[in-house]
Amino acid sequence: MAKLTKKMKAIKAGVDSTKAYEINEAIAVLKQFATAKFVESVDVAVNLGIDPRKSHQNVRGATVLPHGTGRTARVAVFTQGENAEAAKAPGADLVGMEDLAEQIKKGEKNFDVVIPSPDAMRVVGQLGQVLGPRGLIPNLKVGTVTPNVVEAVKNAKSGQIRPRNAKNGIIHTTIGKADFAPEQLKDNLVALLAALNKAKPTTVKGIFIKKVSISTTMGAGVAVDQASL
């Protein structure tokens, strides 16, 4: 087992793992220990009261955070004709069909989001082995397969996140950067939780959002008192 560095020991000593912090206090604790030489991301882990073994209880969705994530996504759009030109206006980084698919197969292009129009799914379907491991397979439910590629690109560029639960029923995503104002981080967290509640499966009984923890890239998790949100 790797030894804890002095910094990690200090962080762990400064966070009470038995306590759920009021949101403003939680953010203050995060910022206190966000001392890396780069601007750390602020991540969130949400424990859901679901049975992830049941497909109808899995949660996934998409929401645009009010203050973005602090990072601009690189967007690849698969479409043709007028849609191809239109997708460039809101900032699509890569636009194409078979030509783009071949470049991606060869590992020649970097991107964070894939958006195809419905007629392009026949092309994107060939990229399952590349997109699958990265969790980038487009999905109609979260709006990444759409005839309105312009709107989808705008959303992706505006800080849209696409949370989905892991096999343990926990959702991991980002809600901003450590240099965001406290109110911005709070607003983003509230928006995320509202989106998750909206996506709650009808078959889930009891408490849906069981625990919320926030952390920075190099920091420890801080549990948040949901009553303070």
From Swiss-Prot:
Keywords: Repressor, Ribonucleoprotein, Ribosomal protein, RNA-binding, rRNA-binding, Translation regulation, tRNA-binding. One of its GO terms (cellular component) is cytosolic large ribosomal subunit. InterPro entries: Ribosom_uL1_bac-type, Ribosomal_uL1, Ribosomal_uL1-like, Ribosomal_uL1/biogenesis, Ribosomal_uL1_3-a/b-sand, Ribosomal_uL1_CS. Pfam families: Ribosomal_L1. It comes from the Bacteria. Disulfide bonds: none annotated. Signal peptide: none annotated. CDD domains: Ribosomal_L1. GO terms for biological process: regulation of translation; translation. One of its GO terms (molecular function) is structural constituent of ribosome. Belongs to the universal ribosomal protein uL1 family. This is Large ribosomal subunit protein uL1.
